Amino acid sequence: MRKLVAGKLHGIHVTEANLNYHGSITLDPDHCEAAGILPMEFVEIWNKNSGARISTYVILGERGSRCCILNGAAARTCQPDDPIIVCNSIYLDEAHITSLKPRIVTFDQDNHILDRLSYSVDIDTDGRYSFAILDEADEPLVIPALVSGA
């Protein structure tokens, strides 16, 4: 079994950091449903400003609020307006990787959904993997590559 990405809220902005709450991250149910994130599910959080990485669990806030609130100890790692990535995962046998279609949701500064993307992995007859990022119409997008200084 391998731990693989199941869904992501990419670039969602922190709306509040509440040190005195019990812990967790509070998210708009609309956003969670778009990415396939469940209430009480453990997620990884990566702060794009500070590089901080934490793990916590999801609680649902008010539907339509576009909230993203870091609670308890997690509030020390993120400040309001920080763009973060919230990622859930799944354990899956490698033989089933081509059936996994993680849902990726991107956001504007006010946490309105910009894009609904998915990831796709295929395997050829020689056992080599290929990877694609697909838009809502299942059309592949360009994948950024690290290019050395030419």
UniProtKB/Swiss-Prot annotation:
InterPro entries: Asp_de-COase-like_dom_sf (IPR009010), Asp_decarbox (IPR003190). It comes from the Bacteria. One of its GO terms (biological process) is alanine biosynthetic process. Binds 1 pyruvoyl group covalently per subunit. The modification Pyruvic acid (Ser) is found at residue 24. The active site is at residues 24, 57. Its EC number is 4.1.1.11. Keywords: Autocatalytic cleavage, Cytoplasm, Decarboxylase, Lyase, Pantothenate biosynthesis, Pyruvate, Schiff base, Zymogen. GO terms for cellular component: cytosol. Substrate binds at residues 56, 72-74. Belongs to the PanD family. Catalyzes the pyruvoyl-dependent decarboxylation of aspartate to produce beta-alanine. This is Aspartate 1-decarboxylase 1. It comes from Mesorhizobium japonicum (strain LMG 29417 / CECT 9101 / MAFF 303099).
